Amino acid sequence: MFILLLFHDNENNTVKKIESYYTTISTVDSQRKKVEIGFSKVPQRVIANRIYVAETLIALGAEKNIIAVNYQNTDRYKEYLPQYKEQADNLRRITFDNLTMEEAVSLQPDFIIGWLTTFDSKGLGTTDFWNKRGVNTYINITSNGLTKHETIEDQEKFILDMGKIFQKEAESKKLVDNIEKAIKTTISSKGKNQRVLVLENEGRCFRNYDSDTLAGNMVERLNGQIVSQGRVLSYEEVIKINPEVIFLVYFNKDRLIQLKQIYSIPALNSVNAIKNKRVYPIRLDYIYTPGVRI
């Protein structure tokens, strides 16, 4: 009887707890397992890992809930989008370079948003570590190879999830509607489908962003044709594919360097995109967990 009563009591407590949540969100944990996180109140002490998270919260009007922006690796060289500059300037004093777990604990957050690698032993600690301390965690699904097929819809889900969590659903829906409107406008204004490669220069070869990457999905949503599915392409393979357009991925201040390098490779002179000067630089953070930059 005691066991039955205990089970019944625990079951009631679980139901009450679920009923107390104003929203429940699907995400993943440090073990890549799908989990549900519930919110009974709007987070007030948020650690936003990387600029794209801070920009998304600014766009939603929730930047005052941020207690720390964590710049990781190359983030320190990036600028916020111009429309968010005023709010971003107010975040400078609470911006950190590569927070440690100990520093994060001392900030007493109630919510942490980041990549999969944010929540490991080299980052801020595992999701389990934080969840046991009553801190919710959210991992962007297109970070660190979490999904086999990255899509624009994944980033729209991130924006909508943030809207639900911070009770800014109208604002998040407007952002997503604007993304879809921009896609339709671009499709209607462009000509024939282009043969496209999205490449990152790796020295003697290129990393290729194929249809399973967010960059590839973006091209295809705009009715472009991603013409290779290999993740690594040699010069010879690029010549054989002969794309009409190349989007060249760069990281921070190396935009002109990357352009100069690809145009100075003699072996590629016969490629249509090179001959016709149709190589367009695109910074990594616009195609990798871009948030509102998409």
Map each language-model feature to its residues.
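Structural recognition of the beta-strand scaffold that forms the well-ordered cores
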Residues: 47-49, 67-70, 111-115, 137-141, ...
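Solvent-exposed, polar/charged alpha-helical surfaces in well-ordered, non-transmembrane soluble domains
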Residues: 44, 54-58, 102-106, 128, ...
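A short, structured surface patch at a secondary-structure boundary
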Residues: 47-107, 111-119, 227
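A ligand-binding cleft/hinge motif common to bilobed small-molecule-binding domains
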Residues: 118-132, 250-263
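Solvent-exposed loop/turn segments at secondary-structure junctions
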Residues: 52-55, 72-75, 111-112, 117-121, ...
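Extracytoplasmic substrate-binding proteins
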Residues: 10, 122-202, 229, 278-294
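Alpha-helical, coiled-coil/dimerization segments enriched in small aliphatic residues
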Residues: 74, 208-234
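Bacterial Sec-exported substrate-binding components of ABC uptake systems
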Residues: 1-56, 164-199
